[in-house]
C-alpha cells in the first residue's frame, strides 16, 4: 500500500430539515390547530483516529464527503429524522488544518479520539412553534440551516519516541533491523529507504519504545533536494533524535563532513528542531582498527564540538546496540517523570513542539510554492533545483508503515 502523508479533502455537513406547515384535520373537529413538526438536524462530520490505519491513501482519490441531510418535519407534530453523522477514519498522528485559514483544528494523537470538523445544520421549526394566544392558526415555518462546509488539509506524522537522522547509507535501516523485529530494505545504494520505517524496540520484559527511520538527507535537502526533506516533519513529535554517522564511508570521505551536512540542513529546515535532544551515534565501528576508531571518534567529536552523549556501535554486528537501547529507555523514563513533576518543563517542551511544527509546515509550504512556480514556468534565482524532490503524484510505488515487535 502506498504511503501518503498529506491530502486535501472537502467536507460538508448535512443541512437541517425544513419545518412543516400543517393543520389538524379530523372528523367532528372543526378548525383544528397547527400540528406541523420541526425538521431534523443535519448530520455532522467527524474525523476519528483509527489505530489500524497508517496512511491517508484512502483520501487520495475520493476527496469529497457529505453527511446526511435532516428530514423535513411531518404532520401531527412529528419531528423529522436527524441526518446520520459521517465519521471518517484517519491514522493516529493526523493533524487537521482548515485550508482557508490555515488554522490547526486539532491533532488526533490517541486511538478513538474524535474531532468535529463540520457541524450539522440546525433544524427548521414547524408552524406549531408559532401558535400564540393571538395567532391560533399560524402559517409560519422556518427552513433548516445549512451545514458547515470547509476544505481540510490532513497531515500525518508518525508517532515515534526516537527518530533517526543521517546521510543515505549511514546504517539507519540496519540499526532498526538490529534492535527490533522490523525488516526495512537494506542495500548498498543511496535512498534504499523511500518512506518512514517504524520498529518497536523491547527493553527488558515489559518496556519498549518506538523508533522511526526516514529517508536519508543529502546536502541541499532543506532546499528540496533528495527524498528526506518531506519526511523530516515526522520527527517533530519524537522525544529524542539519534544522529547516525558512518565512520567508515566507502568513498573515504571525512565522517565529520557528513555530520556537519546533517546539522546544517537540520538548522535550515527548522532551527527549533535542532533544540530537540540529540545523541551522536557513530556507526560501522567494526570496520576500523581500534586505534583508528579512537582517532576518528575524537576527530568527529572535536570537529562538531559535541557536548551530548556519544555512542560507538556496529549495527551490523549488534555491537553496542543493547547498551544504546537501554540508555534510550532510561532517558524516556526520566523524561516522563520530569514532565509529570515539573509543569514548567512540560510547558517548555509543548511550546518547542508547536514551534517545530510551525516551522516545518512553513518550510514545506514554501517549497510547494516554489514547485508551483516552476510548473507555471516562473523561475526564481534564489530557489534551489528541486528536480530530485519526491513527487507523490508521479510515484506509484511505496509501502505502508507497520509496527513490528
Curated annotation (Swiss-Prot):
Main localization (coarse): cytoplasm
Gene3D superfamilies: GTP1/OBG domain, P-loop containing nucleotide triphosphate hydrolases
Stretches with biased composition (Acidic residues): 383-398
InterPro entries according to UniProt: G_OBG, GTP-bd, GTP-bd_Obg/CgtA, GTP1-OBG_CS, GTP1_OBG_dom, GTP1_OBG_dom_sf, OBG_GTPase, P-loop_NTPase
Record: residues binding GTP: 166-173, 191-195, 213-216, 283-286, 314-316
Gene Ontology cellular component list: cytoplasm
Biased amino acid composition, Polar residues: 129-143
Essential cofactor(s): Mg(2+)
Top class in the EC scheme: hydrolase
Location of region: Disordered: 127-148, 373-405
NCBIfam families assigned: Obg_CgtA, PRK12297.1, PRK12299.1
Complexes and interactors: Monomer.
Protein task: An essential GTPase which binds GTP, GDP and possibly (p)ppGpp with moderate affinity, with high nucleotide exchange rates and a fairly low GTP hydrolysis rate. Plays a role in control of the cell cycle, stress response, ribosome biogenesis and in those bacteria that undergo differentiation, in morphogenesis control.
Protein name as catalogued: GTPase Obg
Amino acid at each position: 500500500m502506498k504511503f501518503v502523508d498529506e491530502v486535501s479533502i472537502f467536507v460538508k455537513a448535512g443541512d437541517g430539515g425544513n419545518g412543516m406547515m400543517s393543520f389538524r384535520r379530523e372528523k367532528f373537529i372543526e378548525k383544528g390547530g397547527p400540528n406541523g413538526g420541526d425538521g431534523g438536524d443535519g448530520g455532522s462530520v467527524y474525523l476519528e483516529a483509527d489505530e489500524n490505519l497508517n496512511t491517508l491513501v484512502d483520501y487520495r482519490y475520493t476527496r469529497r464527503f457529505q453527511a446526511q441531510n435532516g428530514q423535513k418535519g411531518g404532520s401531527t407534530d412529528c419531528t423529522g429524522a436527524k441526518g446520520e453523522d459521517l465519521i471518517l477514519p484517519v491514522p493516529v498522528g493526523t493533524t487537521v488544518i482548515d485550508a482557508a485559514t490555515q488554522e490547526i483544528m486539532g491533532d488526533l494523537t490517541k486511538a478513538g479520539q474524535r474531532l468535529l470538523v463540520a457541524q450539522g445544520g440546525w433544524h427548521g421549526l414547524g408552524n406549531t412553534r408559532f401558535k400564540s394566544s393571538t395567532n391560533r392558526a399560524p402559517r409560519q415555518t422556518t427552513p433548516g440551516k445549512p451545514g458547515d462546509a470547509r476544505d481540510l488539509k490532513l497531515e500525518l506524522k508518525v508517532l515515534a519516541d526516537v527518530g533517526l537522522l543521517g546521510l543515505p547509507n549511514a546504517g539507519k535501516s540496519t540499526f532498526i533491523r538490529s534492535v527490533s523485529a522490523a525488516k526495512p530494505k537494506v542495500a548498498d545504494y543511496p535512498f534504499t529507504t523511500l518512506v518512514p520505517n517504524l520498529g518497536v524496540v523491547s527493553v527488558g520484559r515489559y518496556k519498549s519504545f518506538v523508533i522511526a527511520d526516514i529517508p536519508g538527507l543529502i546536502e541541499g535537502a532543506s532546499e528540496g533536494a533528495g527524498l528526506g526533506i518531506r519526511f523530516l516533519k515526522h520527527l517533530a513529535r519524537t522525544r529524542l533524535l539519534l544522529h547516525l554517522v558512518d565512520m567508515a564511508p566507502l568513498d573515504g570521505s571525512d565522517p565529520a563532513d557528513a555530520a556537519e551536512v546533517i546539522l546544517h540542513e537540520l538548522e535550515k529546515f527548522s532551527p527549533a528542531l535542532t533544540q530537540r535532544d540529540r545523541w551522536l551515534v557513530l556507526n560501522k565501528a567494526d570496520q576500523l582498527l581500534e586505534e583508528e576508531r579512537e582517532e576518528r571518534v575524537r576527530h568527529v567529536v572535536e570537529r562538531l564540538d559535541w557536548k551530548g552523549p556519544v555512542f560507538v556501535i556496529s549495527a551490523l554486528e549488534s555491537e553496542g546496540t543493547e547498551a544504546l537501547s537501554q540508555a534510550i529507555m532510561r532517558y524516556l523514563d526520566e523524561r516522563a517523570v520530569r514532565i509529570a513533576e515539573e509543569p514548567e518543563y512540560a510547558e517548555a517542551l509543548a511550546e518547542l513542539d508547536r514551534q517545530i511544527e510551525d516551522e516545518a509546515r512553513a518550510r514545506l509550504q514554501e517549497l510547494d510554492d516554489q514547485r508551483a512556480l516552476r510548473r507555471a514556468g516562473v523561475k526564481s534565482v534564489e530557489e534551489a533545483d528541486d528536480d530530485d524532490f519526491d513527487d507523490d503524484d508521479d510515484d506509484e510505488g511505496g509501502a505502508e508503515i507497520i509496527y513490528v515487535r
